[in-house]
Structures are given as C-alpha cells and as structure tokens.
Amino acid sequence: MIHGLLGRKIGMMQYFTAQGMAIPVTVIAAGPCIVTQIRTPERDGYSAVQLGYEEVEPRKLTKPQQGHLKASGGKMLRYLREFSADDPQAHTPGEVVTVELFRPGQKVDISGTSKGRGFAGVVKRHGFRGGPKTHGQSDRHRAPGSIGAGTTPGRVWKGQRMAGRMGGTRVTIQNLEVVEVLPEQNLLLVKGSVPGARNGLLQIRKAVKG
C-alpha cells in the first residue's frame, strides 16, 4: 500500500457527528493520482513510488518532463511527488490511486505551503511583546529591543529573531484525524485546519507517529 496522496485544499466547514457534536473539518480534494515511476534500491538507492497529480496541457511541461511521463503511461501531469510504500514493486506505472487509500479514524500528516504574510515585524512574526507604551516612550512600541551584547561576543548570534519575510514556507501538521472519506467525489474530510490558502497543493501521508 502507498502511504500518501496529493490533493488540494478546498476550504473549511462544520461537520456534525451522529451524536450531534459539531467539529471543524477541512475539505480536501484528494487524488486521483497516477503512479508515474517506481524507485528501486538497485537503480536509485532507495524504494519509493512516484505519483503524478492534476492533468495539464503538454505545452505547460518541459520536453524532459513530457518524455518522463510518456514513458509511464502518457498522461501529462502537473505535480510529481514521491511516497513510501509497503511494497513499491507491487505497483506499476499507470496505476490509479484514489482517496480510498484512507479510512475514517485514521491519523494523517499533511504538508502544504503556509500563507505568505510578506515582511513582518517581530511582534507579528515572533510574538514579541514590544516596549512600554507610556512614560516618555516614543517610536519604540513594537521594536525588538537589544539584539546582542557588547564587545563579547562582538557580533549578533546566528538565529537571532528579527523582522523579515513571514510565511510562504513548507509546514507539516501531524496526527490529523480523518473524519470521513467520500470516494465518489474524491473528497477527504480532516478534523482541524491544514497549512496554506484555499486551492493550495497538499501532501497527505500516513502518520509517522500515529
């Protein structure tokens, strides 16, 4: 069995359980994905299954990408990602993998690109409390304050938290619970929120710690 799937975030909604409890869920359009390549220890040094997602016009892919996909079934796919599997050799290029890979109650890890926030200050980016608001203080209300000592160490430490670009990075949330699987619509309902904006690409994998 392959341990993951690609999908897109649709949005969030309420889901009512049989007991009438309302829980927040994220709706994900998961798959169908197509197996495009099998990685083997003999040739590649590791075992994995490469999946392709979302058909696209050939002109939007480079010639090497088109050649790679023609060799594995012919469908032109926008995204290619690798996932581990119990037995990669049991799968063949061209095989379709659907959302039925998952089951309600299962724990999954979901990776996506967080929303970009642009250039942000230390209060927003790192949660600094800022300086005093009164007693003659001016222009320093949201400033970081000191960024180091004096002669020793005579420099600013690596990793010092400062203002800068915030968001737009890969984020993984672990152990999210699958609430419902809808194979007819290729939909996956997951409890809680997942990284990124609506329509963002997601990698849904079997939980490492679950």
Swiss-Prot record:
Source species: Chloroflexus aurantiacus (strain ATCC 29366 / DSM 635 / J-10-fl)
Disulfide cross-links: none
Keywords of the record: Ribonucleoprotein, Ribosomal protein, RNA-binding, rRNA-binding
PANTHER family cross-referenced by the UniProt entry: 50S RIBOSOMAL PROTEIN L3, LARGE RIBOSOMAL SUBUNIT PROTEIN UL3C
InterPro entries: Ribosomal_uL3, Ribosomal_uL3_bac/org-type, Ribosomal_uL3_CS, Transl_B-barrel_sf
Task of the protein: One of the primary rRNA binding proteins, it binds directly near the 3'-end of the 23S rRNA, where it nucleates assembly of the 50S subunit.
GO CC annotations on file: cytosolic large ribosomal subunit
Gene3D superfamilies xrefs: 3.30.160.810, Translation factors
Protein name: Large ribosomal subunit protein uL3
GO biological process: translation
GO molecular function ontology, one term from the record: rRNA binding
Subunit composition and interactions: Part of the 50S ribosomal subunit. Forms a cluster with proteins L14 and L19.
Entry similarity comment: Belongs to the universal ribosomal protein uL3 family.
Stretches for region Disordered: 126-152
